[in-house]
């Protein structure tokens, strides 16, 4: 429990998407989660009640926009409205996984930009600030006119290898051209070169990679991406690296969506281990032998403390530190 008097006006609340992560964040911050209830009427309408006074408090609400994505975003919006009407002085939303982030541009005519719509809804609901981890596209920060603290899981993922002495003869692999920047940051942390899987059609999960740019033969290959959804791209990436002579292949991603038959694909894949974080709660039936889950609870807890204390959070922004 934090004894700092400045924390007397700090409140943390969690909604339904990821209570285990919220509890880890609260433990790191040193205060308990606030009391609230989320109920449903018989027709499915959501009703939220704040069960303690928050008048004049700085509030952080923890909610990933994950499956069921439409329910979780609506829960968050209703919660913000309830907090505002209860006279919270500031309402900060902690969104470990920002759902709809893949819809960040018009890929074809007459398509929406739903990542921008989510930002607009949060702003119109009068959220004060957003904290999130590894956006699918960094430019989503520009969809907001309120502060966005964009944190990175790369140091946490890199620590998995450092802590186990897996530091020699590495190569960090981007599964497509779009992820090169992410792979480069991870490579800097591990002191390793990078390679790129030449996927010419990044929206086609069934495409077999045509070639690999970079030397992977005899190396420990670490494939990194921001998310694993169906698992197809990771699976074919592991196959391509094994065929190219990689000694061992690991997979890393921040957000474990694991839709469709992703678990079966990853368990049967050439990966030695698949390392993810807990930005999304993984149900028990989606755990598998090769899965390793690391927690971003300390990262988000530290960010909340720094924001509350009005301290710079640069060291949390920079994946190289």
From Swiss-Prot:
Record-level GO BP terms: 5-phosphoribose 1-diphosphate biosynthetic process; purine nucleotide biosynthetic process; ribonucleoside monophosphate biosynthetic process
Alphabetical list of CDD domains matching this protein: PRTases_typeI
Catalytic reaction annotation: D-ribose 5-phosphate + ATP = 5-phospho-alpha-D-ribose 1-diphosphate + AMP + H(+)
Residues holding Mg(2+) 1: 136
Pathway given in the UniProt record: Metabolic intermediate biosynthesis; 5-phospho-alpha-D-ribose 1-diphosphate biosynthesis; 5-phospho-alpha-D-ribose 1-diphosphate from D-ribose 5-phosphate (route I): step 1/1
Sequence positions that bind ATP: 43-45, 102-103
Cofactor binding comment, as recorded: Binds 2 Mg(2+) ions per subunit.
Subcellular location(s) per record: Cytoplasm
Domain of life of the source: Bacteria
Binding site for Mg(2+) 2: 176
Binding residue positions for D-ribose 5-phosphate: 225
UniProt entry keywords in alphabetical sequence: ATP-binding, Cytoplasm, Kinase, Magnesium, Metal-binding, Nucleotide biosynthesis, Nucleotide-binding, Transferase
Cofactor: Mg(2+)
Keyword Transit peptide part of the UniProt annotation: no
InterPro entries: PRib_PP_synth_CS (IPR000842), Pribosyltran_N (IPR029099), PRibTrfase_dom (IPR000836), PRTase-like (IPR029057), Rib-P_diPkinase (IPR005946), Rib-P_diPkinase_bac (IPR037515)
Stored Pfam families: Pribosyl_synth, Pribosyltran_N
Main location: cytoplasm
GO molecular function list: ATP binding; kinase activity; magnesium ion binding; ribose phosphate diphosphokinase activity
Entry-linked Gene3D superfamilies: 3.40.50.2020
Similarity section: Belongs to the ribose-phosphate pyrophosphokinase family. Class I subfamily.
NCBIfam families assigned to the protein according to its UniProt record, in alphabetical order: PRK01259.1 (NF002320), PRK02269.1 (NF002618), ribP_PPkin (TIGR01251)
Role summary: Involved in the biosynthesis of the central metabolite phospho-alpha-D-ribosyl-1-pyrophosphate (PRPP) via the transfer of pyrophosphoryl group from ATP to 1-hydroxyl of ribose-5-phosphate (Rib-5-P).
HAMAP family associated with the record: RibP_PPkinase_B
Complex and partners: Homohexamer.
Name assigned to this protein: Putative ribose-phosphate pyrophosphokinase 2
């Amino acid at each position: 429990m934090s004894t700092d008097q400045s924390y007397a006006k700090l409140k943390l609340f969690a909604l339904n998407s990821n209570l285990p992560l919220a509890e880890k964040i609260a433990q790191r911050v040193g205060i308990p989660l606030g009391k609230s209830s989320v109920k449903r009427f018989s027709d499915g309408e959501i009703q939220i009640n704040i069960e303690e006074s928050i008048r004049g408090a700085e509030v952080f609400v923890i909610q990933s926009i994950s499956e069921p994505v439409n329910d979780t975003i609506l829960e968050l919006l209703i919660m913000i409205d309830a907090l505002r009407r209860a006279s919270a002085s500031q309402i900060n939303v902690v969104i470990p996984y920002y759902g709809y982030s893949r819809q960040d541009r018009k890929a074809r005519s007459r398509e929406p930009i739903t990542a921008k719509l989510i930002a607009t809804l949060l702003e119109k609901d009068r959220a004060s600030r957003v904290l999130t981890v590894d956006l699918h596209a960094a430019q989503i920060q520009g969809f907001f006119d309120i502060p966005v603290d964009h944190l990175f899981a790369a140091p946490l993922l890199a620590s998995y290898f450092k802590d186990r002495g897996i530091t020699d003869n590495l190569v960090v692999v981007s599964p497509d051209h779009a992820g090169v920047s992410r792979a480069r940051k991870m490579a800097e942390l591990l002191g390793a070169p990078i390679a790129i899987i030449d996927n010419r059609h990044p929206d086609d999960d069934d495409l077999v990679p045509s070639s690999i740019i970079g030397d992977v033969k005899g190396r420990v290959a670490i494939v990194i991406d921001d998310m694993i959804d169906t698992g197809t791209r990771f699976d074919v990436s592991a196959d391509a690296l094994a065929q190219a002579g990689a000694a061992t292949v690991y997979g890393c991603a921040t957000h474990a969506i694991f839709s469709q038959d992703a678990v079966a694909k990853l368990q049967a894949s050439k990966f030695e281990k698949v390392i993810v974080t807990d930005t999304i709660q993984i149900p028990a039936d989606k755990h598998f032998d090769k899965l390793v889950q690391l927690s971003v609870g300390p990262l988000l807890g530290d960010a909340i403390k720094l924001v509350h204390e009005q301290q710079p959070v640069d060291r949390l922004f920079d994946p190289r530190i």
